[in-house]
Amino acid sequence: MSNSWWEITILCHPHLEESITWRLDKFGCSGTSREIKGKSYIIQAYAPQIQYQSLDISALSLWLQQDALVLNLPQPLTRWKLIDEEDWASSWKEHWEPTEVGDRFIIYPAWLTPPEQTDKLILRLDPGVAFGTGTHPTTQLCLESLEMRLSKSPENVVIADIGSGSGILSIGAILLGAKKAYAVDIDPLAVKAARENRHLNQIHPDHLVINQGSLTELLELVSDGVDGIVCNILAEVIIELIPQFSKLARPNTWGILSGILLEQSQAIADTLEQEGWIVAALWKRKQWCCFQIRKAPEN
């Protein structure tokens, strides 16, 4: 079959839902859905065959089992099969509904018609194969943190979004009134999805610059630093990036970091302190957390 997708079905303990959803998102799956079966959950997700072989899905299954061991919960049962693209599109999109996030956002799937009148900021999204649909706790924590940060005088604020996925965070920043945002992701499919979502939200490319790459490429785009850094990726990657954040920083630069499990928070906090950053707040949701940080004053 051309344009085939892996349909991944996982039978799991309900307390594993968030960690499995996070793992699937980071792996590169799209359209995660959930249904209840007795005392268990059935989680389904989809991954493009062009990117993943059966061995890759087997490795994912092992990661899910290891995550369950860490959480001291029963191991999930994972099955997968190939389906064609038409089946994939209809299978997951029917499960995704508009989602309110924080006080100001409502995330609207691209294939649904948004309301003509609402007091919410409508963020339209078609994530494609990229991470970021607005349903995961880490994405919601980041959007809520941006809402707080940009509640006053956002018109001069410049944002850097590292590991931007679908572009949901940088798009959210622009909708909240930020002057400009730079978004980078190492995945070309994520870059493509983010650019399509930029167009979907009628944002000019000069206001939201989206490029393939990581912090190195971002530094080439930004010559005089940014006011805010947002980063919702794996904790291990964040730890590697923190020593370079100062290259992006202005004296009053702040940051929003998530994709971090609670048990990983101490390692993040220690690295931030070593590199001259202060943890201003730590928001928690289920087993996830979101750091709000600011640059420590120079002695």
From Swiss-Prot:
GO CC list: cytoplasm
Molecular-function GO terms, alphabetical: protein-lysine N-methyltransferase activity
Top-level taxon of origin: Bacteria
Enzyme class: transferase
Known EC number: 2.1.1.-
Any GO BP: methylation
Reactions catalysed according to its record: L-lysyl-[protein] + 3 S-adenosyl-L-methionine = N(6),N(6),N(6)-trimethyl-L-lysyl-[protein] + 3 S-adenosyl-L-homocysteine + 3 H(+)
Pfam families documented for this protein: PrmA
Principal subcellular localisation of the protein: cytoplasm
Positions with a binding annotation for S-adenosyl-L-methionine: 139, 163, 185, 232
Protein localization: Cytoplasm
Keywords: Cytoplasm, Methyltransferase, S-adenosyl-L-methionine, Transferase
Function: Methylates ribosomal protein L11.
Family membership: Belongs to the methyltransferase superfamily. PrmA family.
Matching HAMAP family: Methyltr_PrmA
Protein name per its UniProtKB record: Ribosomal protein L11 methyltransferase
Source species: Crocosphaera subtropica (strain ATCC 51142 / BH68)
